[in-house]
A protein has these predicted regions:
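ABC ATPase NBD Q-loop/coupling interface
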Residues: 65-82
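Helix-to-loop junction immediately C-terminal to a conserved catalytic motif
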Residues: 56
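Catalytic Walker B motif of ABC-type/P-loop ATPase nucleotide-binding domains
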Residues: 167-170
């Protein structure tokens, strides 16, 4: 697989040259492969959201480069708008950005600005709605008549309709109830698997990241603390705790069982993995305790 995004010595400074100067991102270098689903974690203020906003030119680096398909996105500043079609950004609580008369028009807005029209536009809108689980009957409704979860899905569909090469999701499940979180996460996973586009998922939920991410970016105090496969990151629980982060709850439970002498594997990150690991023990012993 080819490299779709490369960050070279990337830094960003808020309030540069003032008494309030703060280096939010400090000398970050990494490469992201086409088709990966990358999780992004870090405590509040770690720099993860600032880093994501530099990927599509919403923020311009103080130092370093963002390379998209091998080209510096700031090579031609007047064309930075084109980068934002290729790297789609979904902010936290994106439903507050809905504004059109109908859900259909809202989803179509970005794709129209990219130049789609006619049947191609209609197909893009309906495919994006399908990916995010919006029923066709909702498309002619006002977006303000939708439920909270439906608004969230409509806003995400508007970015998906542009067919970005890279989709950046900043806390997409924030504020949703457990069912809404589950539905949205499943739809993001389906989109990634079927479209083979690169997805970056920022989340405070270690459980969500553990379920879907191929690799994880860990940010701490503006620096890149780790960028490793998911199992490797969560294997380093002591290090994560120093960054104010935790391993998934099910991982803690399985580690406790190992300490009690039960023959369960290391690196269990999800409930499904735990079920597969514990079922043979239950069948053999009849009970755990």
């Amino acid at each position: 697989m080819s490299c779709v995004l490369e960050l070279k010595n990337l830094s960003f400074v808020y309030g540069k040259g003032t008494p309030f100067e703060k280096r939010a991102v400090d000398n970050v270098s990494l490469q992201i492969t086409q088709g990966e689903l990358v999780g992004v974690i870090g405590h509040t203020g770690s720099g993860k959201s600032t880093l994501m906003q530099m990927l599509n030119g919403l923020l311009r680096p103080a130092e370093g480069q963002v390379l998209l398909d091998g080209r510096d996105i700031w090579e031609q500043p007047k064309k930075i708008r084109e980068v934002r079609f290729k790297v789609g950004m979904v902010f936290q609580y994106p439903e507050y950005q809905l504004f059109e008369e109908t859900v259909y028009k809202d989803i179509a807005f970005g794709a129209q600005n990219r130049g789609l029209e006619g049947e191609a536009l209609d197909r893009a809108v309906r495919d994006a709605a399908d990916f995010t689980g919006l029923k066709p009957s909702l498309l002619e409704k006002s977006p303000f008549d939708l439920s909270g979860g439906e608004k969230r899905r409509a806003a995400i569909a508007g970015v998906i309709a542009m067919d970005p090469e890279v989709l950046v999701l900043d806390e997409p499940t924030a504020g949703l109830d457990p069912m809404g979180r589950e539905v949205l996460l499943s739809q993001i996973t389906r989109y990634h698997k079927e479209c083979h586009n690169t997805v970056l998922l920022v989340s405070h939920s270690m459980e969500d990241i553990a379920r879907v991410a191929d690799r994880i970016i860990v940010m701490n105090k503006g620096k890149l603390a780790m960028f490793e496969p998911t199992k490797e990151v969560f294997r380093r629980g002591d290090e994560l705790s120093r960054y104010g982060l935790k391993v998934p709850q099910i991982t803690n439970i399985m580690q406790a069982l190992r300490r009690r002498g039960f023959d369960v594997p290391e690196g269990v990150l999800t409930v499904d993995e735990a079920f597969d690991a514990l079922l043979p023990l239950l069948q053999k012993e009849g009970k755990l305790w």
